[in-house]
């Protein structure tokens, strides 16, 4: 629902709760059934926006879960930042599934991060799916997540962006020809599997899933 750049425009900040309730109600009434909610993307201390920082995450989650239609609610999480950050115990207790981001992690660091989540008391009390829904383009990180029994998210920014972690997307400008456009994040986007980086991921995924 929220990310730091747009959330900081909310005045007063408490509008977060009203928005979370209204959007959840709209989703419940939409008729779509397979909906998972990430209440705030990469909630982290660096937000400098207390209402969506780790200490308040449980309230955001409970706002979403407390919005129901005919007794039905939506499964909800809040994703962490990349690097070493994992959710607090209260955060883990509140959410239905866990979404640690793997941006910036080497494979061994990602495995360690996922193990740290699974070693928490909150996770042991109630094991749940762990979904690394944002990481990188590196297939070795996919392998690391799978080795820990977790799913993994291919995050392919595309050249011409200011974003950089293990991959430097500032290495050259945005491609000028549509057929050559890299990534799935930097606009304009070519949704085809048209670059070696994209092909490496989808070919590995095809092998894992025994796809046709």
Regions found by a protein language model. Name each.
Residues 1-14:
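Substrate-binding cleft and catalytic face of glycoside hydrolase catalytic domains
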Residues 12, 138, 195-198:
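Alpha-helix initiation/capping motif
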Residues 18-24, 29, 34-193:
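Extracellular glycoside hydrolase catalytic/binding regions
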Residues 22, 201-208:
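Charge-rich, solvent-exposed alpha-helical interaction surfaces
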Residues 191-195, 201-203:
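Eukaryote-biased activation of long, low-complexity terminal tails and linkers
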Residues 210-212:
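Low-complexity, Pro/Thr/Ser/Gly/Ala-rich linker/spacer regions in secreted
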């Amino acid at each position: 629902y929220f990310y730091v750049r747009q959330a900081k425009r909310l005045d007063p900040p408490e509008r977060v709760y009203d928005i979370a309730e209204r959007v959840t109600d709209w989703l419940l009434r939409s008729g779509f059934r397979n909906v998972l909610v990430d209440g705030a993307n990469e909630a982290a201390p660096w937000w400098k926006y207390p209402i969506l920082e780790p200490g308040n995450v449980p309230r955001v989650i409970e706002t979403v879960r407390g919005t129901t239609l005919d007794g039905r609610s939506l499964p909800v999480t809040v994703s962490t930042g990349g690097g070493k950050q994992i959710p607090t115990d209260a955060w883990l207790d509140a959410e239905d599934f866990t979404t640690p981001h793997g941006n910036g992690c080497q494979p061994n660091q990602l495995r360690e991060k996922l193990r740290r989540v699974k070693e928490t008391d909150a996770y042991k009390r109630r094991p749940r799916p762990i979904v690394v829904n944002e990481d990188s383009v590196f297939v070795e990180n996919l392998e690391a997540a799978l080795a820990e029994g977790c799913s993994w998210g291919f995050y392919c920014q595309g050249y011409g962006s200011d974003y950089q972690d293990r991959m430097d997307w500032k290495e050259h400008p945005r491609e000028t020809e549509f057929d050559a456009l890299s990534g799935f994040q930097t606009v304009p986007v070519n949704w085809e599997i048209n670059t070696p980086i994209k092909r490496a991921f989808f070919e590995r995924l095809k092998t894992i899933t025994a796809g046709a």
